[in-house]
Amino acid sequence: MAIEVQPAVSPHLVVSDGAAAIDFYVKAFNAVELGRVPGPDGKLMHAALQINGSTVLLNDDFPEYNDGKSSTPIALGGTPVTIHLTVTDVDAKYQQALDAGATVVAPLEDQFWGDRYGVVRDPFGHHWSLGQPLREVSMEEIAEAMKHQQ
């Protein structure tokens, strides 16, 4: 029997404490844990969550498999990646993330591209943007609005 494959893009996050990260994502983003695989030393080798209808993978940091270097955003001094969640009721979802322990990177505001949008940093250094479309805006309108941004 053939396995049905659904093409997808799923972020795979490296965190300093996988169990705590799962707890945070459940509280902050209503994540559903799909499964976890602990290693012999108790560190999390692999976990799968569903957040906002998409799969997010994560594991504990394993410097011993990376030339002794940590690869968490905190150890690297930040992250160049932001994971975006398109949601309804963005004000409540943003506050939920803050209440769970996230910190503000960009405050929640109505944006020129038509979304109400903000960015938070989770306790593990990963950035999450939350946006709710409020109105349709053409690419031409966005380009024109960009001319007036500081």
Predicted regions and their residues:
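Vicinal oxygen chelate
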Residues: 1-12, 22-123, 131-150
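Short acidic-aromatic low-complexity motifs
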Residues: 15-19
